[in-house]
């Protein structure tokens, strides 16, 4: 099992995933609550966080605030944390560095199934934008682990 986090300045999305890619838990919550979750979940699960990368362009305060939260999440973890860059997620899920959030979501639906409806929930029922990205991060980690074996 794995805890995957898409960090933000005040809230972060997370997904807990089994080794078969099935979803145990997901959501988006305030970063302080994410820290509390990390303290309990990483007793059992490894953790992966999307890491910020510099592409030579100016960045704003939000990027630096997110970096601080990434550090706090790592500090709260009881196991080794893997950092994965967004470009690696794009390449793994879509085979293109130019992939957008929409193309990542489409590729995940193609691979695992549709979102579904309340009456007929699918693999991703209840997912929202940032949760999709946390799941893509977790899938990338699990795919890379399988390649190593």
Language-model features: where?
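Phosphate- and other anionic-substrate recognition elements at nucleic-acid/protein interfaces
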Residues: 1-149
């Amino acid at each position: 099992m794995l805890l995957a986090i898409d960090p933000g300045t005040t809230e972060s999305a997370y997904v807990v995933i089994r080794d078969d890619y099935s979803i145990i838990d997901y959501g988006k919550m305030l970063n302080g609550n994410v820290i509390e979750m990390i303290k309990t979940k990483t007793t059992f699960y490894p953790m992966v966080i999307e890491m910020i990368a510099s592409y030579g362009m100016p960045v704003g305060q939000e990027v630096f605030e997110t970096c601080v939260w990434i550090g706090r999440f790592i500090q709260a973890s009881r196991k080794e944390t893997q950092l994965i860059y967004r470009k690696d997620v794009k390449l793994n899920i879509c085979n293109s560095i130019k992939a957008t959030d929409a193309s990542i979501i489409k590729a995940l639906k193609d691979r695992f199934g549709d979102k579904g409806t309340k009456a007929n929930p699918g693999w991703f029922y209840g997912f929202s934008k940032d949760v999709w990205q946390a799941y893509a991060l977790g899938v990338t980690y699990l795919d890379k682990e399988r390649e190593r074996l």
